[in-house]
Amino acid sequence: MLVNNFQLIEEYMDSHPCKEGEFHFLQIIQRNKENPNLGSNNHVIREYMVENSEYLEKHKNEISILCQLFNARAYIHISKKTYKDVGFQVLNTLAEYLSQENYHGAKHLYSTSVGRCKSSDKTFLVDIDTKEKEFVNECINCINIYCQPFDNINKVVLTVPTLHGYHIITKPFDLRHFGESYPNIDIHKNNPTLLYYKEK
C-alpha cells in the first residue's frame, strides 16, 4: 500500500506560507516496527528543513527513493519552527549534554533541539485508526462544535491519510470532552504527520 501526501502538504504550505526564518521539519525514519533487525530504536535516515512547497517538490523524488530503499517513512511537522529558536535550543541542549558528559548524544543535537522547541503555530494531532469516513467526520464535528474554544468552529486545519486511518491536524482545543467521547483515540501535541510510505 502506498501513502503519498506530497500534494496535500504542498497545498497546505501554499495556503499557510512560512514567514522569514520559519520552516517545517521533515525526517525520513526507519521504524523498528517495519525493520525488526534495527533493534529497539528507530533510525533517522535524513532530515530536511522545508521552507516552502517548491523545496518539497524539488526533493520529492529523493525522499520517495530513500523511503523505498530503506523501507522507511517520511514524516513532516505541520507546526512551524524558527531557526532562531532552534539555534538557542541547540546551545541549551549542548550545555546539558556536556554537563552530563553525554558526548555521544551530541550527534543528535540538532534534531533533538528541533523536537524541544515550541512551535510558532502549535497544533494537535488526532490519530484515527480507521478509514471509515462517517466516523472521521463525526470526530471532526466533535472537535469543531463541542470542544472549547467554542468561538472557533474551524479548529481542524488538515486531514492527512495514513496507512490505516487519518491524522486530523487541529488548532489547540480543550481535550476533556473529546477524551470522554473517544477515550481510545490518541492525541499528540508535538508529533509529525505521515508524508510518504510505500509498504513492502
Regions found by a protein language model. Give the residues of each.
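Short hydrophobic/aromatic beta-strand micro-patches
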Residues: 169-171
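Polybasic, proline/glycine-rich intrinsically disordered low-complexity segments
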Residues: 182-186
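Signature for HUH/AEP ssDNA processing cores
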Residues: 1-162, 173-181, 194-200
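Short, cationic low-complexity segments
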Residues: 188-190
